[in-house]
Amino acid sequence: TVQYLLKRTLPQGGLAPGDFVLWHAAAGGVGLIACQWARALGLRLIATAGGPEKCRLALAHGAEHAIDYRAENFVARVREFTGGAGVKVVYDSVGKDTFEGSLDCLAPLGLMASFGNSSGPVPPVAPALLASKGSLHLTRATLFTHIATRAATQAMADELFAVVASGWVRISID
């Protein structure tokens, strides 16, 4: 999941070292891999998590900043961390509860990458909303599109195993 999001689900012009991204639910299994891989790519990952312990976990795995969404306004904190500029991409597995706020975290021309709906599905979106918030882009990424061919699946797996073998990403199984 992290491979196809960080390497294939990208804003206009891609991502470069120093770019800010926001990752919701960053203290889960996928999120902790994302924190590490983003750091390896030189990205400045802002994590959201539920509670101080989960925020510390995201920071320990490479997030530059962590926001306790239960106690803090994540939109205000993202704007603070980015000097008001916003992030290039929001990676969101939460869905309904974070969708509108996530759009407000994006820089103009930013990408909202929805890949889950743990809080429920996002309601229908009027395209004019994306225009009014800065000509934003929206995608609903799914693994099956990215592994449609054996060659694509192998290339993605090779990249994952390489980043794990390099030591940049450590996968914990509890």
Describe every region a protein language model picked out.
Residues V2, A38, A58, V90, ...:
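Terminal peptide-recognition signature
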Residues T1-E72:
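Mid-domain Rossmann-like dinucleotide-binding core that forms the NAD(H)/NADP(H) cofactor-binding site
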Residues L41, D97-V169:
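Glycine-rich phosphate-binding loop and adjacent beta-alpha segment
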Residues L22, I67, K88-Y91, A113:
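N-terminal Rossmann-like NAD(P) cofactor-binding module of classical short-chain dehydrogenase/reductase
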Residues N73-G84:
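Short amphipathic alpha-helix with an adjacent loop that forms part of the alpha/beta core around
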Residues G31, C55, V75, F99-E100, ...:
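Short, well-ordered alpha-helical microsegments
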Residues L59, R79, L130-A131:
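Alpha4-beta5-alpha5 "output face"
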